[in-house]
Curated annotation (Swiss-Prot):
This is LPS-assembly protein LptD. GO terms for biological process: Gram-negative-bacterium-type cell outer membrane assembly; lipopolysaccharide transport. Component of the lipopolysaccharide transport and assembly complex. Interacts with LptE and LptA. The keyword Membrane applies. Residues 1-22 form the signal peptide. Keywords: Cell outer membrane, Membrane, Signal. GO terms for cellular component: cell outer membrane; transporter complex. Belongs to the LptD family. It comes from Xanthomonas oryzae pv. oryzae (strain KACC10331 / KXO85). The gene is lptD.
Amino acid sequence: MRRALRLLPLPLSIAICLPAMAADKPFNWGLCPTVDPLPGFDGAPAADPKAAEMRQQLPTDIEGDQLSGTSTTPQYQGNVALKRGDQFLGADNLRMDTETGNYIAEGNVRYQDTSFRMVADRAEGNQDTDTHKVTNIRYQLVERRGNGDAESVDLQGQVGQMHRSTYTTCDPSQPIWRVRAPEIDVDNGEGFGTARNAVLQIGNVPVLYFPWFKFPIDDRRQTGLLFPQFGLSRRNGFDYLQPIYLNLAPNYDATLLPRYMSKRGFMFGTEFRYLYEGGRGEVTGNYLPNDKLRDKDRGSVFYSGYHNVNSNWQARSSISWVSDTRYVEDFTSRLNGMGSASSLQSTVGIYGTGETWTAGLMAERWQLTDYTLDERSLPYNRQPRAYFNWEKPFGIFEAGVYAEAVRFTHDDSYFVQPPSPSVPGEANNRDNNDKYVRTNIRNQEYGSGSRLDLKPYVSMPLSGAAWFFTPTLAWRYTAYQLDSTLAKTGPLTGDRSPSRSLPIASVDAGLYFDRETSLLGTNYLNTLEPRMYYLYVPYRDQDDLPVFDTRPFTFSYGQLFRDTRYTGADRQNDANQLTLAVTSRWLRQDDGREKLSLSAGQILYFSDSRVTINNSTNAVAGSEQTIDQGKSAWVVDANYMINDRWSMGATYQWNPNSRKEDLASLRTRYLLDNDGIINLAYRYRRNLIDNSDQLKQADFSFLYPINPSWSAVGRYYYSLQDRKPLEIIGGVQWDSCCLAVRGLVRRFVRNRDGQMDNSIQIEFVLKGLSSFGQNTDRTLRRAILGYYRDDLYLVPPSNTTTNPDDYDPNLIP
């Protein structure tokens, strides 16, 4: 999503022109007075840029309580109002020379046009030449909160010059910051002001001097320098990024990103954005010639964009590339916005959707970005992939088909030599990651193959006011064409054209009961929703089928009602099982909000499930626990709204076979005044293969408003299993009408080896003028769920519905 544009200021040493820049978050003016410093004047015309351009061709209208003088030198007294186009001039007295066009206005002078609103002691000028001089003024920008005062201002058309003036977005009664300059030129036509020999004051203390400083007076963008970003780290040394914004056209722009790192050298980068009626896109590239630490050239390219072909089809692409496997860790910082990842995904495709169908043709490739891993950790590339999904009702029946054809490729894997510590504890040394060595020893040769997957089905969805009954019969056919290298890779049998076909039968049925009840004086609608799901799939030996993109689903409440345990088409489990589940809800009758919901369910296995993914040579596929005749783990989901501020949720899985819990999750959230929030969560997962603890974590985060101006933020994310913190954040925020200051201290796990790193982030926001320092919003939004209150109401993509971007019939309930 394209961000809004804003202006940033410059450092002491550079005289510059500042354009508007993309902002991650709109300025919060909530602490400002509800009225403008200078409210609009009664009778003044609305702001109209077109009227401003035609101002001199329009007639002048003058009215007042009394009129005296002659026809050539009239004098108006009392509630005088002069109007022409977008101009308004109000005063107690006005003398006019109709032959020359000169005028003098005195007493309670008020002036307004498309850009400015001001009050003054006196105004004089010439209407014919559209020149004016206003003295002893207080002003406000019409389209922004910018305001200030000046000894005088000279106006000519849409250009003006203020003398001995100030500029701020603060309320005049509390000017926390302001720019003071002997001259400020204002160009309403171009949409910016220029201050010469300007001084930025915080309170009454001067803190920065600007020989030449430009700032916006409306929302138009301007070419120039953005405020630099800088930091200090052990990896890069002193790090300085100076963005240069280029406003090339109304629908495209660019930002040059020169960056200096004292330990590495100069990096050159650029960002280009474009927008047109049928689409938009953004490309970013970086190049570091001869990195002094790595002794080689390094770089990256990122692109994302889309084009609407027509109302049914859209082309989309997302391309990512880095020069080496250490690039992400070396250059991960708030300076370029990259995040840590073990791989990067690139996709290019065209996608279509209609009333009864979805389709797509795309290509996908993965790149390794973690130097501690080899290529075996990468998923298969899909080059290309085509899918088509269709479903349509026919009377009481519904028929459909899910189809996919894919060509899979994979780069060969080469052995990565891990560090061999010579002394105890050396493996945990901060710089020991440099000792990982990528060798020329191939440890796995990958072949390629193609797969066709077809799944036609017919169902009969029947329902009434209190029940539903849906039998479904499907047939799944999957065929492969493998090259000889892959076909001969164990445990495959050497068959280059294996296939699998089998029927899938299911019955999904449920009832709905409700009753009206009351509890503690509140009326509720209480529901009881039992549900049954029977699934039968005969066994087919699939050991001769490769595993390309198939993984076991994480067992959850939603998994109780799927017709397969796997995400892809390489495996289709056999099944003779019955799911029994029930949900109960308590809904407040006055507003329909859910007070409490409880769901519980279990699968009864009438026979062993013999199909597994454990014999795969694809390391990414993982492994799974075999399914024996008996019962699955109990799955319980609960959500409870204690009140409008406090909510709790829990997920619990109890395995009757091992008599142990497989999963436990507890989370609670409390909403404070002034958009504050407190989150607390506990997560536990057991490794079902060896019964060890796979994950045991506690997570506490908060945004705590101390008062309307001060707030504290923090996160403590701890691994109980490893007995070490994963991330610690502490910070404070101070906010006012026109100034915000944020400071954070962060300690976090840096890489897969568990090495820790520290960072300090400080950000100053002069609202409506500038923002400098490091972007704290990105860090806090990721770490504290609800840091932006609107994030709490975002609905994540469902894993039980078809997404036109990602065919997978296994995700269809």
